[in-house]
A protein has these predicted regions:
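C-terminal catalytic/substrate-binding lobe primarily of soluble NAD(P)-dependent oxidoreductases
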Residues: 1-7, 203-448
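N-terminal glycine-/serine-/threonine-rich beta1-alpha1-beta2 phosphate-ribose binding loop
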Residues: 1-117
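Short catalytic-loop micro-motif centered on adjacent basic/acidic residues
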Residues: 43, 102-103, 125-128, 151-154
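Short, ordered loop/turn segments at secondary-structure junctions
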Residues: 47, 106, 130-133, 156-157, ...
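Short gly/pro/ser/thr-enriched loop/turn and capping motifs at secondary-structure boundaries
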Residues: 50-51, 132-137, 158-162, 183-187, ...
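Rossmann-fold NAD(P)-binding glycine/threonine-rich loop
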Residues: 109-121, 129-157, 162, 167-168
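Rossmann-like NAD(P)H-binding beta-loop-alpha module
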Residues: 144, 148, 152-230
């Protein structure tokens, strides 16, 4: 794909985008946009307005060129006067002449409301907030399509990157037996000390004998990763964001997880084709075409998967794949499968291509056929008494006492499990025992 001809400044006008959320993702998008001739970001909405001002300054735009506005009228005037506008309510900038909303707030209800309003005002939506996309992405996509607009995930985050890699493989006629991403966590093994460090969890643990599990050898792959897991039980092997992102991928591609909490093996990059294939061929999956994640197992001197994405494909043309294997592509021990992967995700640094594709080509880089196939639900991990408030917080937007699980999507009803991010800040109206999925009937919900 030659991007410079697709997005040629000599034949296209600049795209004007607004941004909601100025955290790590939003700030990186804002910075990178300054180097893109076809992209301008003259408005940012965030709950903490100083964060947006700081993001503009970090991107090379002085505070003197930024106006914090407290009403729609103030925002319109500041915009007309050539200032970059910062607000704490999306309604204040919804009527500005903008082409695209990049939604990266991570706040599910506010995010959904902003996206819906943007669509009503004629903007395309690049949805970065997976918390929102996993719950109402298909609804927002339909609303956008009805108005001739684009709703899409954004390149730079794993869902869009994996959706793109899957679609690339399908266009080329590859039989994809597995797909997924590396988790939030690297497990870094130091063979000299027999220690495993997980920087993401700020833990280092002794693992005597791990050296014997460094390679599969002639042993079954499932046996080896099972022994690794047993040595690393004090570390978390999956997170709610991992599950949420794969729900988004499932709804865009039709591929489903093999089990509600994934297999999530601790695995080296070159082990992917032995693991993410059917059990009949020595892998983990009950059936082909499944989604999963893995925790990248590596030495300190080896490169990380960096939260990247992968597909595992069938090696139908044995002769060609022997050539490719010799060039270094990871293949399974039985030579039936190969892993193709993209070891990076660059946050907002690469989201600009999704913005330009939506505005200039009406193309959704994250796929145009979103369906409610998979729900991220919440399950109590301990007894939760009536009156418990399901507060959501932290970097990973977790709920204390509740874990995420992936289930086939179901209509919302009194006894149906609710999507995880609809539980946020709700109060239990009855006791919920450990192991139970939390349903609508368990919550004290407002009548509206």
């Amino acid at each position: 794909m030659f991007y410079e001809s697709l997005f040629n400044p000599s034949i296209h006008r600049p795209v004007k985008a607004c941004l909601t959320g100025a955290g790590e993702f939003g700030a990186s998008f804002l910075f990178q946009a300054q180097g893109m001739p076809l992209l301008e970001v003259p408005a940012v909405c965030t709950r903490t307005v100083q964060r947006a001002v700081d993001a503009y300054e970090n991107a090379g735009i002085p505070a003197s060129k930024v106006r914090v506005c407290e009403s729609a009228e103030d925002a319109k005037k500041a915009y007309a006067d050539g200032f970059n506008v910062v607000v704490d309510s999306f309604e204040y900038i919804a009527d500005l002449p903008l082409d695209v909303l990049v939604e990266s707030s991570g706040a599910p209800e506010a995010s959904a409301a902003a996206a819906e309003l943007a669509i009503e005002r004629g903007m395309h939506v690049v949805m970065v907030s997976k918390e929102t996309d996993s719950v109402v992405g298909s609804i927002l996509a339909r609303k956008a399509a009805e108005r001739g607009l684009v709703y899409t995930t954004g390149d730079g985050d794993q869902p869009s990157l994996l959706i793109g890699l899957i679609s690339w493989g399908r266009v080329l006629g590859m039989n994809i037996v597995g797909a997924g991403k590396s988790s939030e966590y690297d497990f870094i093994y130091d063979p000299a000390r027999d220690m495993v460090l997980c920087p993401g969890q700020k833990q280092e643990i002794a693992t005597p004998g791990m050296g014997s599990l460094w390679q599969f050898g002639n042993r079954p792959a499932e046996e080896v990763v099972g022994k690794r897991r047993a040595m690393l039980t004090s570390l978390s092997h999956r997170s709610v964001p991992d599950l949420c992102e794969m729900a988004v991928v499932a709804n865009a591609t039709g591929m489903m997880p093999d089990r509600p909490l994934f297999h999530a093996p601790v695995a080296r990059i070159d082990e992917m084709p032995d693991l993410f294939c059917p059990k009949a061929d020595g892998g983990l999956f009950d059936a082909p075409g499944r989604l999963d994640i893995f925790n990248c197992f590596r030495r300190p001197d080896e490169a990380s998967m960096a939260g990247g994405v992968f597909i595992v494909v069938e090696c139908k043309d044995k002769k060609s794949w022997q050539v490719l294997k010799a060039k270094g592509h990871p293949c399974s021990r039985n030579d039936r499968y190969a892993a193709l992967y993209h070891p990076a995700h660059l946050l907002g640094v690469e989201t600009g291509t999704s913005v330009l594709a939506a505005a200039l080509m009406k193309h959704a880089t994250g796929g145009g056929n979103l369906r409610p196939l998979c729900d991220l639900c919440g399950r109590a991990v301990r007894d939760l008494p009536k009156g418990t408030v399901l507060d959501m917080g932290g970097h990973h937007h977790t709920i204390d006492g509740v874990e995420g699980v992936l289930n086939p999507a179901a209509a919302i009803g009194p006894d149906a499990a609710l999507p995880f991010y609809l539980l946020s800040h709700r109060t239990l109206c009855r006791d919920v025992p450990a192991g139970k999925l939390i349903t609508l009937g368990d919550l004290d919900m407002p009548e509206e």
